[in-house]
Amino acid sequence: MMTRLAISGYRSLRDIRVPIGALNVVTGANGSGKSSLYRALRLLADIAQGRIIQSLASEGGLQSTLWAGPEAFSRAMKAGAQPVQGLVRKNPVSLKLGFSGTDYGYAIDLGLPLPDSLSKFSSDPEIKVESLWTGERLGRANAFAIRNGPSVRIRNDNGEWRQAYQHLASVDSMMTHCSDPRDGIELLMLRERMRDWRFYDHLRTDREAPSRRPQIGTYTPVLASDGSDLAAAVQTIREIGDAEEMDAAIADAFPGAHIEVTSSDGYFELEMYQHGLLRPLSAAELSDGTLRYLLLVAALLSPRPPALMILNEPETSLHPDLLPPLARLIAQASKRSQMVLVSHALTLVAALDAEADSRQIALEKQLGETILRDGTPPDWTWPSR
């Protein structure tokens, strides 16, 4: 389980270290940095998919995503006695992402490429350093894999360092190119775990949402990120998952209601039966809030729960009366998967805060920098270039 998250140089996250528990609720005012924290987790997941450079490019490139303030704030700047201004840099420009847990830790350092007038890709960032270690904090004795520039070394079963790569491209991660079942088994295991992280921030409920139409019926243990295969996901839960928990979650939010999946010529369609109505309502007839709740039920009750699930503002379109049932559903899901939830809804935050394993991560801005409002940041060591 992840216990520490560290981000440096990414948007408003100049240098933040966050303690992570089983159920984490990220809160804060608009512009406090919640979305940046969410995006940073997405970038970490993209490393395992080999997409980190492309993902940064889609955000406008490294220059657009880097922290826009000074490298550090002086005491006078923080006290307001001196205007905020840039100083001579002591360290190279970098964007760093990392996390650690009870078993493994990983960190990456991306920076600017050397000037090359012949290349049209000079704005692409380069991977300067990567490191994989055991435990929560990087040290000399617990590192398993180290990447410096194009060189990658991996520690074998005898504790000896082996040269795994000498010419790894600056846009390729050792996570995707150096993991093998022999000496790179730790890289392989962590890569597959990161690939399993699940993000939900764009569950569509608009009139043209695919979940409102009949869908091809096929085994679906994991709901798509946009919810397009809702009917198939619901039927999969009913056949191989916890159908009783799904029915209870529906009844908790809509007393007297239940859902069924109909099949015709290989296509599935979701129907909802509500107390007092003479016929079921199809997904096309459901309100945005009702459909969104059903999508969240299908996501949270997946028969194949991920190691980590991240929900971005799940309360969107939901009536306040649905937030307590949603909180109970999320709390149950956190017993199967580690959860990170970004939310504005005070009712949802308060309901989740009452859970025994819940940890509230309150963010705020100070001189444009995102900081933790409460608590002591965990210890963290970045690998050096």
Model-derived segments and their meaning:
Residues M1-R14:
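N-terminal pre-Walker A segment at the start of P-loop NTPase domains
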Residues R11, N24, R42, S287, ...:
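Catalytic acidic motif of RecA-like/P-loop NTPases
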Residues D15-G21, L301-R304:
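Phosphate-binding P-loop
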Residues A22-S64, Y293-V297, T347-A350:
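Phosphate-binding glycine-rich loops of NTP-binding sites
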Residues R39-P115:
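Conserved P-loop NTP-binding catalytic core
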Residues S94-I240, E244:
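Electropositive, glycine-dotted interaction segments
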Residues D229, Q235, E239, E244, ...:
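Conserved ABC ATPase signature
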Residues P324-R385:
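C-terminal lobe/lid and adjacent interdomain/linker elements of RecA-like ASCE P-loop ATPase modules
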